Amino acid sequence: MENLHFQSIDQVDDISTIDEYHVAKNAGLNEKEALSCISRYSRDNARTPVQWNDSANAGFTSGNPWLPLNPNYKEINVASQENDPNSLFSFYKELIALRKNPEYKETVVYGELIPYLEEQHNLMSYYRKGDKTLLVLGNFQKEPQTVKLPSACHKVLLNNYPELNISDDSVILDNYQAVVIEL
């Protein structure tokens, strides 16, 4: 699901978001700018009805939801992602399967978390060290990003893209690509 872009402050339920809206307005932002600011950080984003399917009220309720539905619920919903191997839902299932895999469970669940390349902009990167060493990388920008590998890759465990551009000493992550690599 994506965040709901509020069209009016009347759609907002969270009191702290309403307060932030008024702070933004008092600082000189117009209504559209203030709504844009609060839409990004509002706690109501996590409180909107779950988009189960493309039926009325996204399959969430037969009544009136307390918050508005995201208008994209016909395209983005659980039912549309359940059988799509490239969906975010499927990627989460793969993450959970990795966590439960007896070969990696000790490292994923109990391994030491060690930051890696903390200064590289828009990159999430860290090790999980236990009986194995895993490197988790996430590119959080629109452009590809080259990441130096500390050692050769033994195995790519997870990848949210069909391909990975990897060599012995670096990996090129596409925009918003996330991988888990065993070193």
What kind of feature is each model-predicted range?
Residues N45, N159, I166:
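Residue-level signal for pocket-adjacent positions within structured domains
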Residues S167-L183:
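C-terminal beta-strand-rich structural cap/linker in extracellular carbohydrate-active enzymes
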Residues K129-G130, Y161, L183:
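Short, flexible beta-strand-to-coil junctions
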Residues L113-L117, L164-I166, V171:
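Short, exposed beta-strand/loop patches in secreted or surface proteins that constitute
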Residues P150-P162:
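Solvent-exposed beta-hairpin/edge-strand motifs
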Residues F140-A152:
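Surface-exposed beta-strand/loop patches in extracellular or lumenal glycoproteins
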Residues M1-L134, K142-P144:
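Loop/helix patches that line or flank the sugar-binding groove of alpha-linked glycan CAZymes
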Residues L137:
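Short hydrophobic beta-strand that contains or immediately precedes a catalytic carboxylate
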